[in-house]
Amino acid sequence: METDTGALPKKQDFSEWYNEILWRAEIMDVRYPVKGLYVWFPYGFAIRKFVYQHLRELLDRDHKETLFPLLIPEQEFMKEAEHIKGFEDEVYWVTHGGTTPLEVKLALRPTSETAIYPMFALWVRSHADLPIKIYQIVNTFRYETKQTRPLIRLREITSFMESHTVHATWDEAEIQVESEIALTREFYRNLCIPIIISKRPDWDKFPGADYTIAVDAIMPNGKTLQIGTVHHLGNHFSRTFNIQYEDKNGEQKEAYQTCYGISERCIAALISLHGDDKGLILPPTVATFQVVIVPITIGKRHEDVLAAAGKLKNDLENAGLRVTLDTRDLRPGAKYYWWEIRGVPLRLELGPRDLDSGKAMAVTRTGEKTTICLANAAEDTTSILTGITDAIRAKAGEHTKSHLCTTHTMDGLDIALNEGKVAVVHWCRDRTCGDTIEEKANSSLLGTEVRSEYIEATDGPCIICGKPGKATLVGRTY
Ligand SMILES: Nc1ncnc2c1ncn2[C@@H]1O[C@H](COS(=O)(=O)NC(=O)[C@@H](N)CS)[C@@H](O)[C@H]1O
């Protein structure tokens, strides 16, 4: 599909850059005539496929994939008081089948606890049925009233991975929470996205959860994006939905649960953190094409060059790489531009001189220039791709580290936030001090028990009242 040409906005104008890159790199078409609903272009959908393929590989180590209905009957949805309170303003309802009014209104799942847990009540009888660990990757619907943005805040979340587990004890559920956190670390390491993990304050936890562990990334404009959440549900839902099991002594016991969610925000973070003024930069593990071969066929030996380029493509594909050979009738420079904006990590240029030297020019999207030996193409290319991954990961790490700081005063917090940074402060965990931090610094208190390789989270006197406080993450959020 032909998209516009011409310079991209600079990445420092992040909002404009982000919107333009979704169009120019053929990720999403935002022209769909319903607010908060967007269309995947095939190129963007291929990135989603590789990202979620990796997420499935990680989940399949310990969970089983399944699929539950989209529509939830009102009586089930309305069963869990806190859950309703959390979602009553966001849930879409289906009220008619054709022209016939439905006897029972049906909710479009905003998340699937109230679809799945009545079935768990049927599946769980004995301790031998536990643990249950399932997930699904589905679309969910939330009538978001804050500003909608493609991949970031949608009304139809098209790529909502939700995992739901059932355990015999609270402790086993907590072990599962830690296991999902480890899985999330591995997932985001593969995407070269640095994350900061923290425990959301009680007033910001998932409706019906005992506690929520959240995963945040720091976006180029310094705002944090919540790119994953793991919830310990205690026996809150099992009590409401009667998910009980007979233990070894024949007694009826309530089960304990977790749920865990990642949406296409992971792709928003991938695009935002790694891109530059020339466009996307995709980590090789999830790039639609890892290599683009551009034959330089100006002048003589046209056929030889094309033949050598074809052989190079085969060699690389036989080594399992995703390669495209661009033989379009365009100037090489136009091809370079086309694939740079689409974030292809490695370009191989092959001209007549290279045939004689048995080499090809290798230009990485992270700014390196080197050569590969055609006789050793697969090995040379694979090692360059590894180097590209390391460079992408290092750059994102530098960005995150430089946008994180510790401060002990409200003035310091204000300065940090106005500089587009995220701060670690000390908070006594008293709600009134929390509210003061949020109001005075126009910020969100993201959480305590901060875990990040980029910050030393120590304890100290509360930034408001001076009482003993805990390291607490504070930022401005999407
Ligand atoms: N409107 C939205 N658009 C895109 N992603 C969203 C939206 N709302 C939430 N998310 C993402 O989905 C994740 C899970 O959503 S959640 O409400 O926190 N948790 C749940 O729904 C739980 N049932 C776990 S699946 C969030 O961490 C956030 O990254």
Curated annotation (Swiss-Prot):
One of its GO terms (biological process) is prolyl-tRNA aminoacylation. CDD domains: ProRS_core_arch_euk (cd00778). Its main location: cytoplasm. It comes from the Archaea. GO terms for molecular function: ATP binding; proline-tRNA ligase activity. One of its GO terms (cellular component) is aminoacyl-tRNA synthetase multienzyme complex. InterPro entries: aa-tRNA-synt_IIb (IPR002314), aa-tRNA-synth_II (IPR006195), aa-tRNA-synth_II/BPL/LPL (IPR045864), Anticodon-bd (IPR004154), Anticodon-bd_dom_sf (IPR036621), Pro-tRNA-ligase_IIa (IPR002316), Pro-tRNA-ligase_IIa_arc-type (IPR004499), Pro-tRNA_ligase_II_C (IPR016061). Keywords: Aminoacyl-tRNA synthetase, ATP-binding, Cytoplasm, Ligase, Nucleotide-binding, Protein biosynthesis. It catalyses: tRNA(Pro) + L-proline + ATP = L-prolyl-tRNA(Pro) + AMP + diphosphate. The keyword Ligase applies. Its EC number is 6.1.1.15. HAMAP family: Pro_tRNA_synth_type3. Homodimer. Consists of three domains: the N-terminal catalytic domain, the anticodon-binding domain and the C-terminal extension. Belongs to the class-II aminoacyl-tRNA synthetase family. ProS type 3 subfamily. Catalyzes the attachment of proline to tRNA(Pro) in a two-step reaction: proline is first activated by ATP to form Pro-AMP and then transferred to the acceptor end of tRNA(Pro). This is Proline--tRNA ligase. The gene is proS.
